[in-house]
Amino acid sequence: MPPETPPLTREQIRNIAYAFQESRILLTAHELGLFTALGSGRHTSAGIASMIGTDPRATERLMNALCAMGLLTKENGRFSNSQGARECLVQDSPGYLGGLMHTVHLWDTWTTLTEAVRTGTGVRLRTVEQKQEQWRSAFIAAMHDRAMRQAPAVVGQIDLSNVTRVLDVGGGSGAYAMAFVRAKAGISATVFDLPGVIPLTRGYVEREGLSQSVATVPGDYLNDGLGKDFDIVFLSAIIHSNSPSENAELIMKCARALRPGGRVVVQDFIMDEERLTPSAGTIFALNMLVGTESGDTYTEAEVSGWMTAAGLSGVSRQGTPFGTSQISGRLI
């Protein structure tokens, strides 16, 4: 039996209930460009309000709260970014968390959680093509920020013997495709994603100087073919956006895109049979409830079943350092 969790105190429950306040303060400041406006300087709240086009009194109250949170400092009526804010929240800094703009957009979808639980479906439309341009750019930036940090380790767990062609389905910025071509000389990769995403993909790939090794193909993986003769078809953070039937069909398409001996590799939150671990996956399932038409987090048995039905053999699972797992199957 797993060890019992100590009971939550009244104060801990209140802290959970009010945790949204600090989150909203940070996201509002980020959305307004407050940290970037401060930069490395020292400014009055009135000066910042003038720069970002906000009410002076309300801006001072916001900045005072940011001081209490450790994100700003205040001395003689002038505010500065803390070291952490300078490193992570100022747009030109190397460690800039540009993906937080996607979190700003997630706030809107999460406010619909009560209605989503009542009705069983998210309020928002599923496809990126139906999103506004700003949403799409922020989403891809958020995924890129995380993927660039995680991709080398994730790809490093995959046996690349005899691999020369990789298809990254729904590859977004191309971070994983770029990790594949960097992991082994002679590998070429193709990113398959929606027509509205591909121009963003090309921009990220060009900035990394990998346009000769990473190709792009526009399409909708639910409706279009994926090509053929790939050694690996890779799906990272894809299946959670889809329904079980959509995933079964998608894995079938991926299998058809393989050479004999090739593999489909799925990376995602893979839940236990009780759907309680990993714990991050339980929360992410709600993110899919409010943000997609029919997405979810799935169990190992579900993913393995789709692979077996698609004719893949030797289905196996391995964990990653990031709370996700890889499940792979081979076409014999």
Segments the model singles out, each with a brief description of its role:
Residues 1-74, 160, 165, 169-332:
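Alpha-helical subdomain
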Residues 3, 10-32, 36-42, 50-51, ...:
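Conserved Class I S-adenosyl-L-methionine-dependent methyltransferase catalytic core
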